């Protein structure tokens, strides 16, 4: 029986990386996958899911008015049966679109894997995450860490000076320059800690073996 899965985490936990790996695992075995990404996410090339470690894959960029159930039916008529549907940045789904994902699972018997944030920078649920938490068959937490080494569960919005921002619109598209994942304690204190440039993370000179 197909299920709806919600993989949730704080920022920079590798959600898109896990999504792309899952899609690759299906395709490696000759199975078709359908990937969706929200058109509102303008961090990368339009209609592309990109991970922080450099993996990328084309996806259908959807808007809030799109019916994901109908789109999946239409796309499947053009290709062989999909073995899995994968959703990136699922926190941006509407209530209706989360219901449509349950229809893909229940009526079309296709597993749906949705990946997204649980809460915004104020510690409040996104609409998409709220209904995924309520309706998904399986909830899986992807873990990342705070600068102190504890598990990070909060998403802190920061300004250009690295200071915590506590007011503003719920949606502000950004990456490491706008958000940092922290534990609850450092979220309360407004302490973002320090992040490192990507080239420092992959510097071969830092490896001693």
Swiss-Prot record:
Endpoints of the signal sequence: none
Stored InterPro entries: P-loop_NTPase, Thymidine_kinase, Thymidine_kinase_CS
The entry's keywords: ATP-binding, Cytoplasm, DNA synthesis, Kinase, Metal-binding, Nucleotide-binding, Transferase, Zinc
E.C. designation(s): 2.7.1.21
Positions of ATP binding: 9-16, 88-91
Location of this chain's protein in the cell: Cytoplasm
Residue positions of the active site: 89 (proton acceptor)
Catalytic activity: thymidine + ATP = dTMP + ADP + H(+)
GO cellular component terms given for this protein: cytosol
Pfam families linked to this entry: TK
Residues given in the record as Zn(2+) binding sites: 146, 148, 183, 186
GO term, biological process aspect, one: thymidine metabolic process
UniProt cross-references to Gene3D superfamilies, sorted A to Z: 3.30.60.20, P-loop containing nucleotide triphosphate hydrolases
Family matches, as SUPFAM superfamilies: Glucocorticoid receptor-like (DNA-binding domain), P-loop containing nucleoside triphosphate hydrolases
Gene Ontology molecular functions: ATP binding; thymidine kinase activity; zinc ion binding
Subunit structure: Homotetramer.
Family membership noted in the UniProt record: Belongs to the thymidine kinase family.
Protein name listed in UniProt: Thymidine kinase
Name of the gene: tdk
């Amino acid at each position: 029986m197909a299920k709806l899965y919600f993989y949730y985490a704080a920022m920079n936990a590798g959600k898109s990386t896990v999504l792309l790996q899952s899609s690759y695992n299906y395709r490696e075995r000759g199975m078709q996958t359908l990937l969706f990404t929200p058109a509102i996410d303008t961090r990368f090339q339009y209609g592309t899911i990109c991970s922080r470690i450099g993996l990328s894959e084309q996806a259908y960029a959807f808007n809030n008015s799109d019916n994901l159930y109908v789109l999946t039916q239409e796309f499947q008529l053009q290709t062989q049966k999909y073995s899995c549907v994968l959703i990136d940045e699922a926190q941006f789904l509407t209530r209706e679109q989360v219901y449509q994902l349950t229809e893909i699972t229940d009526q079309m018997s296709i597993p749906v894997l949705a990946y997204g944030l649980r809460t915004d920078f104020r510690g409040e649920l996104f609409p998409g995450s709220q209904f995924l938490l309520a309706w998904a068959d399986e909830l899986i937490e992807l873990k990342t860490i705070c600068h102190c080494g504890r598990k990070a569960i909060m998403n802190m919005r920061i300004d250009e000076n690295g200071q915590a921002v506590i007011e503003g619109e719920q949606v502000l598209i950004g990456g490491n320059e706008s958000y940092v994942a922290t534990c609850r304690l450092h979220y309360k204190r407004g302490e973002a800690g320090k992040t490192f440039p990507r080239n420092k993370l992959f510097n071969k000179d830092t490896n001693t073996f």
